[in-house]
């Protein structure tokens, strides 16, 4: 495995952020800035696209590629015996679900926002085919990170179905309030039911972290740091 790429900002308990799409953290500056008021925010760039890797050859990705890379990041930034909070959005939400399945001991609480595990839905294969076709049709001339996502991330990640039960209080599966009635809202509900995680609504839609960064960040903070335990220590 190559050295993982990540950026660190803020202070407080560690919050690992895994972006969606191809993992490029573009546009996440405002939400991470807000989160950095309460957390040491570690933003993982699984393909190194924001660290000079854009334009380099990319192999087809699997959730395990990203989750094991995220685990390597945690091994670098956490002291022995510590655990981290985790936030993943969209494809990053799938990666953090897989991270929780593989390495629960390093994780305090995981928030997976609209992970597109659409195969959990009735007619899951059909739902996945329509989702993939719709995204590709709408981004036929995509370049940069979106092109990488469509070519190497979209199909393998949407085939992922979580097959674990989360310990109580360790997983929140979120969907945007503006996504009600849409396939990814229903998917988030199904993921919560499958894993035993809590379900929560967050501000905005699928891109709530970009559309409403302050409100989204505050909802993350409320979820991870309940008001009766602000700045809870990171112990397992």
Give the predicted meaning of each segment.
Residues 46-84, 191:
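Active-site loop/oxyanion-hole signature of alpha/beta-hydrolase fold enzymes
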Residues 45-49, 116, 203-205:
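Short beta-to-alpha linker loops that shape the active-site pocket of alpha/beta-hydrolase fold enzymes
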Residues 82-121:
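Conserved hydrolase catalytic core segment
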Residues 73, 219-227:
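C-terminal alpha-helix
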Residues 141-211, 217:
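Conserved serine/cysteine hydrolase catalytic core
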Residues 17, 86, 112, 173-175:
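Structural beta-sheet core signal
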Residues 115-158:
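Helix-rich cap/lid subdomain of alpha/beta-hydrolase
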Residues 1-53:
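Conserved HGGG/HGGXW glycine-rich cap/lid loop of the alpha/beta-hydrolase fold
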């Amino acid at each position: 495995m190559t050295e993982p790429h990540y950026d660190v900002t803020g202070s407080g308990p560690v919050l690992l952020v895994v972006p969606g799409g191809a993992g490029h953290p573009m546009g996440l500056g405002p939400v991470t800035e807000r989160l950095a008021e309460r957390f040491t925010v570690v933003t993982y760039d699984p393909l190194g696209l924001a660290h000079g890797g854009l334009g380099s050859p990319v192999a087809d990705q699997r959730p395990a590629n990203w989750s094991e890379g995220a685990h390597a990041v945690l091994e670098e930034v956490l002291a022995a015996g510590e655990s981290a909070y985790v936030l993943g959005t969209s494809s990053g939400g799938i990666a953090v679900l897989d991270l929780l399945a593989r390495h629960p001991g390093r994780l305090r609480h995981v928030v997976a926002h609209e992970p597109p595990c659409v195969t959990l839905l009735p007619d899951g294969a059909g739902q996945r085919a329509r989702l993939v076709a719709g995204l590709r049709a709408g981004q036929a001339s995509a370049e940069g990170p979106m092109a990488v996502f469509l070519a190497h991330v979209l199909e393998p990640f949407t085939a992922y179905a979580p097959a674990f039960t989360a310990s109580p209080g360790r997983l929140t599966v979120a969907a945007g309030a503006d996504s009600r009635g849409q396939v990814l809202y229903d998917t988030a509900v199904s993921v919560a039911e499958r894993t035993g995680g809590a379900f929560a609504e967050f501000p905005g839609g699928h891109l709530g972290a970009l559309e409403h960064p302050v409100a989204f960040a505050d909802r993350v903070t409320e979820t991870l740091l309940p008001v009766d335990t602000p700045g809870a220590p990171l112990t397992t």
